[in-house]
Amino acid sequence: VIIAAFRKSKGIYPKLLIAQPYVLHRTLLRLLSAPPRLVVITDVGVDEAVWPSVSRSLEDLVAKGVKILWIDHHIQTARVSLDLAELGVSLLYTSSGCASSIAREVFAPLTDDPSFYAKLARLGEIADNVAVGDRELLFLADRLVAALSAPSSKEEFKAQLVRMWVEERKFINDEVAIKAEEFEKALALKLAEIKQRIVFEGERGLLVDARDIKLGGLAGHIASRLARERGKIAIVVFSPNEREVVATCRVPPDAEFNAVVELAPIAADLGGGGGGLSRAAAVRVPSSSGEQLLKRLREALTR
């Protein structure tokens, strides 16, 4: 939606880079060799563990004359708003929706097809569980989330999808359907394996130790599926590499548990970081703290 707005107002197609919070500083460093006129950071929350590096990269970009707009809905980003202001970074923040809500309300009217892009942004809101929709919208949101999460969906596919939205104004195509089917098959296989790795299940929630399983980017979806099936808080702990252990948490609608408030302090105590939202959060700690992380998470589920 934001790219479409820029294309109409500036006549340009911005370059798209995809980054997770814990590697945002590396992505920003890539821009320093050939600084653009404007950088828009969208839906990337602040990871407290790498915030000093992100802050330095932002400062370096601003010093080179780059204007920066940060659009987000994660509380960790709002908490550094004064720092961002001092750096000269503009923050567009919402606590009542998500980044897609801002895209729908602010940027969709600036495109050459406000109706299409408002609908596209609504799909993002549905995917982030801050809005509901009719059967068509729910289907489209489900297929897009599945396709984007397929094991073979790399940055190239994601960039192609964005270009399709901007140039063809189509929500999905045959490739989306194929990748969505791939995702469902991969998720079913991993779920069967994961259910053998539940190390704790109590009245409030369950804890999975999947450090010896390659999850291929499916951890959040596995936690979401378990939370929905069991009606409990679901925390999946896994190792994306030899250096780190990650815990991703999903909270069902009727559970009283703030995922980011509970998990972030644990990670900080163990020399890590992370963030997220009240019902969906992820933190990472050094691999040497994996056992301690499991212990602390189990304690959090039994309080």
For every predicted segment, state its role.
Residues 13-15, 67-68, 233-234:
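Hydrophobic anchor at the start of a short beta-strand
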Residues 3, 7, 37, 69-70, ...:
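A structured phosphate/pyrophosphate-recognition subdomain
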Residues 12, 38-45, 202-212:
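Short, basic, glycine/proline-bearing loop/turn elements
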Residues 1-35:
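Anionic-ligand anchoring segments at beta-strand to alpha-helix junctions in alpha/beta enzyme folds, i.e.
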Residues 22-24, 45-50, 213-215:
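Short acidic, S/G/P-rich loop/turn micro-motifs used as interaction or catalytic elements
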Residues 44-85:
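Active-site cofactor/cluster-binding pocket
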Residues 135, 206-303:
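Glycine-rich, acidic loop segments that terminate in or are immediately followed by a histidine
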